[in-house]
């Protein structure tokens, strides 16, 4: 009997719950269709929105805090392994081994204490704070269901009140029929029964309305008080949580700093006792910096003449590459210069060497000179003039030009238009080949008034080739015809050379810094990264000078002074500096 009773109670409860769900669903449908009004509380809805926002922020903070704790634990494990590695490599006979082991143990304990305090003062507090949200969330949902029940009971009661007159008409109609069929005494009892039944339904609907309203108001009042209070409590919770985290982290780093200082003292004492075995870390140059060492210099950019080991632009012999030290001298990290970003490499034009056939072709009758404006040519004085101190010192009267079928060779390969050449008569039969003719004096008149320094000795091979190309009978004719250049040609040639005879010690050298080698022009902007570097802009002209100490020169770097600074200050020590060679182009 007890089992049957419990089953009946359970079945009745289930039926009641199903009935409530159906009633609520019906009420929501009517509200959505607009056939039933809905009770709304805008203030409470705002509190619910704040509650959902607060729950979202708290959940995110809890997730991030757990991630932070996981990172602390991982850092603890990494620090522990590093300390164990130090203990393993620390030899027993080394001083300070016990201190190092103690520092490692304290380091491990400090990490454990930091992690545990974070869990106690931050994570557990966060869990407690978020623990109240599920209960309030369920109460908000229950309050919404009770509001639907209240609206349903209210609508049912209002419908009974509205249908009161209709029910009375339905009750009166059967009475009129009964009056004809039933005796008089039965009609009064039947009417009283129908009225009592209608009143009972109305009373039940009213009781349900009052009950639903009471339950809803109780829950609504509680939530109206708790939700604003919970929303305002978030400020204090955030402050306490982050203050705890910041304080714990500050204390942790202070203690860790002390341990690291103690470990550093132990290692310093170890280094002092093993000072002879100090390991020096050598910095490696970066990929984008110009490499340093004994490597071949980078080829010059387009438009600049390629210098050969025999003859340079200033007609000074260039030291052979074999004279450089064979091994790279290591430098301290302070001496290693980090190079600037490498600009796009220019296209390189391979230098052309003068072959013997080409030298011989200069004296051939079929040789047609061409004008070359891209590469300034270097003037090489003919053999007879190279032994003289100055061309202006030749005190010979010029001879009138005479026709000669022999074409005068161009100085140092300088191209001169064919129409500017004038035929002269050969003086081979008149003047001896060993004596300088007066035609040489006429040739010297067209040159600028500069005293030529004795140039370096030319290679033996070139001398033999030139000497072999001219027979004894043709030597005097060639010397005579070399002076037959008109004044216009001579002036054009000297303007093209533009002071290429770098060996002269005239007035052109007075405005140049001591040890001047050549000029370069910046092709790209370069920002100086050190006090001893030059700040360059595209188009700046730099006067290149040698390093005071050749061992300090790094591969890819040159020493120089900007031409504008030199012309303004004339102070080499203050104006000079180093700059990357690949940012410039040689112009002279």
From Swiss-Prot:
Coiled coil: 15-42, 193-274
Biased composition (Low complexity): 474-484
All copies of domain SH3, residue ranges: 515-588
Origin superkingdom: Eukaryota
Keywords: Acetylation, Cell membrane, Coiled coil, Cytoplasm, Developmental protein, Differentiation, Endocytosis, Endosome, Membrane, Nucleus, Phosphoprotein, SH3 domain
Role, per record: Is a key player in the control of plasma membrane curvature, and membrane shaping and remodeling. Required in muscle cells for the formation of T-tubules, tubular invaginations of the plasma membrane that function in depolarization-contraction coupling. Required in muscle cells for the formation of T-tubules, tubular invaginations of the plasma membrane that function in depolarization-contraction coupling. Is a negative regulator of endocytosis. Is also involved in the regulation of intracellular vesicles sorting, modulation of BACE1 trafficking and the control of amyloid-beta production.
Protein name: Myc box-dependent-interacting protein 1
Organism from which the protein derives: Mus musculus
């Amino acid at each position: 009997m007890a089992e049957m009773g419990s089953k009946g109670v359970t079945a009745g409860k289930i039926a009641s719950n199903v009935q409530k769900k159906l009633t609520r669903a019906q009420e929501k449908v009517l509200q959505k269709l607009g056939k039933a009004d809905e009770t709304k509380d805008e203030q409470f809805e705002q509190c619910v929105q704040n509650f959902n926002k607060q729950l979202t922020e708290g959940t995110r903070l809890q997730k991030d805090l757990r991630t932070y704790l996981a990172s602390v634990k991982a850092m603890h494990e990494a620090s522990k392994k590093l300390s164990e590695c130090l203990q393993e490599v620390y030899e027993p006979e080394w001083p300070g081994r016990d201190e190092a082991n103690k520092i490692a143990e304290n380091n491990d304990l400090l990490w454990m204490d930091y992690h545990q305090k974070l869990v106690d003062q931050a994570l557990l507090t966060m869990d407690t704070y978020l623990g109240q949200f599920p209960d309030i969330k369920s109460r908000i949902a229950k309050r919404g269901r009770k509001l639907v029940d209240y609206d349903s009971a209210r609508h049912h009661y209002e419908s009974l009140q509205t249908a009161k007159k209709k029910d009375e008409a339905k009750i009166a109609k059967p009475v009129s029929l009964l009056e004809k069929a039933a005796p008089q005494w039965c009609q009064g009892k039947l009417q009283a029964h129908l009225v009592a039944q209608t009143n009972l339904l109305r009373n039940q609907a009213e009781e349900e309305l009052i009950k639903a309203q009471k339950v809803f108001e109780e829950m609504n009042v509680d939530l109206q008080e708790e939700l604003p209070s919970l929303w305002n409590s978030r400020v204090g919770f955030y402050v306490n949580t982050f203050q705890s985290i910041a304080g714990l982290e500050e204390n942790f780093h202070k203690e860790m700093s002390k341990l690291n200082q103690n470990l550093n003292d132990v290692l310093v004492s170890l280094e002092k006792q093993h000072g002879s075995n100090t390991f020096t870390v050598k910095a490696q140059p970066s990929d984008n910096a110009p490499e340093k060492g004994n490597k071949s210099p980078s080829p010059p950019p387009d438009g600049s003449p390629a210098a050969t080991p025999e003859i340079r632009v200033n007609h000074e012999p260039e030291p052979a590459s074999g004279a450089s030290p064979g091994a790279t001298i290591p430098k301290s990290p302070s001496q290693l210069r980090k190079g600037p970003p490498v600009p796009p490499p220019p296209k390189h034009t391979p230098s052309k060497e003068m072959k013997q056939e080409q030298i011989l072709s200069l004296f051939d009758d079929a040789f047609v000179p061409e004008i070359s404006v891209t590469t300034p040519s270097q003037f090489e004085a003919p053999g007879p003039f190279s032994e003289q101190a100055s061309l202006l010192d030749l005190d010979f009267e010029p001879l009138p030009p005479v026709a000669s079928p022999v074409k005068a060779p161009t100085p140092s390969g300088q191209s001169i238009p064919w129409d500017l050449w004038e035929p002269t008569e050969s003086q081979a039969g008149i003047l001896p080949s060993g004596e300088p003719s007066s035609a040489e004096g006429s040739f010297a008149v067209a040159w600028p008034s500069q005293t030529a320094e004795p140039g370096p000795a030319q290679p033996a091979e070139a001398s033999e080739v030139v000497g072999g190309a001219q027979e004894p009978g043709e030597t005097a004719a060639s010397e005579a015809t070399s002076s037959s250049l008109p004044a216009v040609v001579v002036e054009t040639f000297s303007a093209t050379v533009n002071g290429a005879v770098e060996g002269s010690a005239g007035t052109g050298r007075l405005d140049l810094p001591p040890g001047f080698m050549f000029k370069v022009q910046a092709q790209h902007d370069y920002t100086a990264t050190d006090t001893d570097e030059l700040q360059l802009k595209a188009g700046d002209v730099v006067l290149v000078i040698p390093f005071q100490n050749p061992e300090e020169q790094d591969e890819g770097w040159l020493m120089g002074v900007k031409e504008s600074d030199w012309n303004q200050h004339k102070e080499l020590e203050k104006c000079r500096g180093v700059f990357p060679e690949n940012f410039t182009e040689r112009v002279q």
